[in-house]
């Protein structure tokens, strides 16, 4: 873009190098006029839009239209730029949706931003020509419709270099990929048993004829543990067998075998107490269940005996009732037979002599 006091378009650009957004074949390579003609349906002018609306229009055009320019000139420029990008091997920029606007710039219109760029851009470029050089010829001032979207966004401060050029991780070399990573440093331990750095389980000290020897039984083979002796050093081969020195003075008791932190056949006192408590509780539960069954059985037997007794009493009372009814019936029949039978007295009227005649 040409400004008064500048020699050309490229001399008037700010020191920051424009980002290769147009090399991706996007709408950023179009000018405002070409972008306006490409959209066609936008009724609002770009100059009256604020920066937020402009970015939304650009994102909508990127999603709805195919990659490339609308005219033959822009298509050729995009293909050449893509070839240069493939030859240079520059990494692709981020998606346009990740562009951010400063808070003071988001509500400004495109015309206001363009006027600010014209005011501040001309003054900074006026100091570029030297005193010995002849004054450059005056050029026509570039308008907003002739500037590309990429250049406008770069000069407005929307696009940042750290946003569009992500760091490229270095490719691993074949030698580095083939070599395995070094193992982490192992912590030094007082005693090494085989290839393990874990402390071995300790064993009660072995009694010698002239002192005590503190020993340990290891899990790994070939590891040696130094044993301290008042007279001569005695070493162990990791399996409980003493080497180096007179073994006749050792006690005849064998070295106990260590199995998972304890002696074989011996359980921890806490586990023994838990098992014993569980067994006692189980025995108590069984005894309580047996007593409950006995009480229930005795109660059932008592109820059965009482029912049998009541049945016998009922039968006796039934018999007595039948006898009483029979006796009453017999008495009634006997009384009736006395009144009707031959032995009954006949009651009749007799004539009495009441008169002298």
Curated annotation (Swiss-Prot):
Region (Disordered): 166-185
bZIP domain: residues covered: 275-338
Expressed in which tissues: Highly expressed in leaves.
Keyword annotations from UniProtKB, A to Z: Abscisic acid signaling pathway, DNA-binding, Nucleus, Stress response, Transcription, Transcription regulation
UniProt cross-references to Gene3D superfamilies, sorted A to Z: 1.20.5.170
GO biological process, one term: response to salt stress
Record-linked PROSITE patterns: BZIP (PS50217), BZIP_BASIC (PS00036)
Pfam family, one: bZIP_1
InterPro entries, alphabetized: bZIP, BZIP46-like, bZIP_sf
Family under the similarity heading: Belongs to the bZIP family. ABI5 subfamily.
PANTHER family referenced in this protein's UniProt entry, alphabetically: BZIP TRANSCRIPTION FACTOR 23, CAMP-RESPONSE ELEMENT BINDING PROTEIN-RELATED
Entry protein name: bZIP transcription factor 23
Upper taxonomic lineage: Eukaryota, Viridiplantae, Streptophyta, Embryophyta, Tracheophyta
């Amino acid at each position: 873009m040409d400004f008064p006091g500048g020699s050309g378009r490229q001399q008037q650009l700010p020191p920051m190098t424009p980002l290769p957004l147009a090399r991706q074949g996007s709408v950023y390579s179009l000018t405002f006029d070409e972008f306006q003609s490409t959209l066609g349906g936008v009724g609002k002018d770009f100059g009256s839009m604020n920066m937020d609306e402009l970015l939304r229009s650009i994102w909508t055009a990127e999603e709805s239209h195919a990659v490339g320019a609308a005219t033959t000139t822009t298509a050729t420029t995009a293909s050449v730029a893509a070839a240069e990008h493939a030859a240079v091997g520059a990494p692709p920029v981020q998606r346009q949706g990740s562009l951010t606007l400063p808070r003071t710039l988001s509500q400004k219109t495109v015309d206001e931003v363009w006027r600010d760029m014209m005011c501040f851009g001309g003054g900074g470029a006026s100091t570029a020509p030297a005193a010995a050089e002849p004054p450059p010829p005056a050029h026509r001032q570039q308008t907003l419709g002739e500037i590309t979207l990429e250049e406008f966004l770069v000069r407005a401060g929307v696009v940042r270099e750290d946003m569009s050029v992500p760091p490229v991780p270095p490719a691993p070399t074949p030698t580095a990929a083939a070599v395995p990573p070094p193992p982490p440093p192992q912590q030094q331990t007082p005693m090494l048993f085989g290839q393990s750095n874990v402390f071995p389980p300790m064993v009660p000290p072995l009694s010698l004829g002239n002192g005590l020897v503190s020993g340990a039984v290891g899990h790994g083979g070939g590891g040696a543990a130094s044993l301290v002796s008042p007279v001569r050093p005695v070493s162990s081969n990791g399996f409980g067998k003493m080497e180096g020195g007179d073994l006749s003075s050792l006690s005849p008791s064998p070295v106990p075998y260590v199995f998972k932190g304890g002696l074989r056949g011996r359980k921890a006192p806490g586990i023994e107490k838990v098992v014993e408590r569980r067994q006692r509780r189980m025995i108590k539960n069984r005894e309580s269940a047996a007593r409950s069954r006995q009480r229930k059985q005795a109660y059932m037997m008592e109820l059965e005996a009482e029912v049998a007794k009541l049945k016998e009493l009922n039968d006796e009372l039934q018999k007595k009732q039948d006898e009483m009814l029979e006796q009453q019936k017999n008495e009634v029949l006997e009384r009736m037979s006395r009144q009707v039978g031959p032995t009954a007295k006949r009651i009749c009227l007799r004539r009495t002599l009441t008169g002298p005649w």
